């Protein structure tokens, strides 16, 4: 099972998804990340 949490440390506009995805994996050591409709970075993790 996975769940999404808003990234607490991602800076800047969340376009494109790649920036957010990289941030979640490299900086927060989570599975992945994506930009949602609110233009914020949401990280996916196991929960």
From Swiss-Prot:
Keywords: Antimicrobial, Disulfide bond, Fungicide, Plant defense. It comes from the Eukaryota. GO terms for biological process: defense response to fungus; killing of cells of another organism. Disulfide bonds join 3-47, 14-35, 20-41, 24-43. Epidermis and vascular bundles of pods, stems, roots, leaves and wet or dry seeds. InterPro entries: Defensin_plant, Scorpion_toxin-like, Scorpion_toxin-like_sf. Possesses antifungal activity sensitive to inorganic cations. Belongs to the DEFL family. This is Defensin-2.
């Amino acid at each position: 099972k996975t769940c999404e949490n808003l990234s607490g440390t991602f800076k800047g506009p969340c376009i494109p998804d790649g920036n957010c995805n990289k941030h979640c994996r490299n900086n927060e050591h989570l599975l992945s990340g994506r930009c949602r409709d609110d233009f914020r970075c949401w990280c996916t993790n196991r929960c």
